[in-house]
Amino acid sequence: MESKRMEEPYFTFGIIADIQYADMDNRFNYLKTSMRYYRNSLTQLKAAVEEWAMESIKPAFILQLGDIIDGINTKDKSSKTALERVLVEMDKLPIQFHHVWGNHEFYNFSREYLNGSKLNSQARGDRIDRGGGTSENGEFNDESFYAYHFSPCPKFRFLLIDGYDLSPIGREKTSPKYDIALNLLKEKNPNEDLNSPTGLEEVQFVLFNGGISPSQLDWMERVLTSSDEKEENVFVVSHLPVHPDAADPMCLVWNYPEVLSVLQSHPCVVGYLAGHNHEGRYCMDPYGIHHLTFSGVIETPPESRAFGTMYVYEDKMVLKGRGLVEDRTLYYRDPKNKAERH
């Protein structure tokens, strides 16, 4: 009996990415390389919700890794209707969702709208030292970033970061960050179509990606330093991947080397979870951080699935994947060697 208790996880959580629902017929993606199943993505979500509800160990929460509806909804002004249809399905699960914002959130809605919507899950995070989407008086502040952290269990923390903090699509044109982002993008990408990586040395500098501002990097440093001191295990969560071996290089955060430098300098970081690259990829970097990019629901054939449940233990996390998401056992870096990070 004791051994059985020892095998039980501290907690579990669900993960799903790139639902990109729209009430539209199937069509190829932007690059014409893969089919997108717009209506079926809602069916895929329903299947995930049903399975999570039936699990013997109920997930403590669900991570929704961004791009909840597709930008194509703007063509017939159905963005709000599409979002409501997705949220209705999520609400059938009596478990909290933590939402990340991706490029398709910003194709459909302004940052101010998202801040006041159900996709703003900041209230479910710790209220101490949040990144914040509001100013000190509670009003919306377009210069802030959407980021927060929470601890579902002692010694474990999740840090959600804003990959479109610096982005022309993630900021209003009146925002100073808009000008900074657009100037940087045009400096790195001379193409007329800013979504095209043709001829670029740094192919991540396309319009559908974004960057992390110095202020957000500083905030991440503070949170991770605190977690180091508390000897916590931290999972960093974003829409955009940050490791070249965990995604197509065209899908990375603009300044991913800076972000990686921050993550790798903190022994508390054990994993980085992302979406955006629909085929999904995985790598463990030289510092022992697991970079897991999840397959996108939108490009998952009707006969398959694309979601998972992570089981969190003292020394490892075990992913039970469905369909395109593979099962994985991911051990944390040896605590004795954590101090070797620099």
UniProtKB/Swiss-Prot annotation:
List the taxonomic lineage.
Answer: Eukaryota, Metazoa, Chordata, Craniata, Vertebrata
Identify its protein family: Belongs to the ADPRibase-Mn family.
- Top enzyme class, one word, equals hydrolase
Matching entries from SUPFAM superfamilies are given as: Metallo-dependent phosphatases (SSF56300)
Query: Origin organism of this chain?
Result: Xenopus tropicalis
Q: Which Gene3D superfamilies did the record assign?
A: 3.60.21.10
Q: Which InterPro entries match?
A: Calcineurin-like_PHP_ApaH, Metallo-depent_PP-like, MPP_ADPRM
The GO molecular function terms of this record are:
ADP-ribose diphosphatase activity; CDP-glycerol diphosphatase activity; metal ion binding
The entry's protein name is Manganese-dependent ADP-ribose/CDP-alcohol diphosphatase
Residues noted as binding Zn(2+) 1 in the record, renumbered to the chain:
18, 20, 67, 278
Q: Which reaction equation describes what this protein catalyses? A: CDP-choline + H2O = phosphocholine + CMP + 2 H(+); ADP-D-ribose + H2O = D-ribose 5-phosphate + AMP + 2 H(+); CDP-glycerol + H2O = sn-glycerol 3-phosphate + CMP + 2 H(+)
**Binding residues for Zn(2+) 2, per the UniProt record?**
67, 103, 239, 276
Q: Which cofactor does it need?
A: Mg(2+)
**Sorted alphabetically, which keywords does the UniProt record give?**
Hydrolase, Metal-binding, Zinc
Family annotation (PANTHER family): MANGANESE-DEPENDENT ADP-RIBOSE_CDP-ALCOHOL DIPHOSPHATASE, PTHR16509
Role played: Hydrolyzes ADP-ribose, IDP-ribose, CDP-glycerol, CDP-choline and CDP-ethanolamine, but not other non-reducing ADP-sugars or CDP-glucose.
Q: What is its EC number?
A: 3.6.1.13, 3.6.1.16, 3.6.1.53
- Subunit-structure text: Monomer.
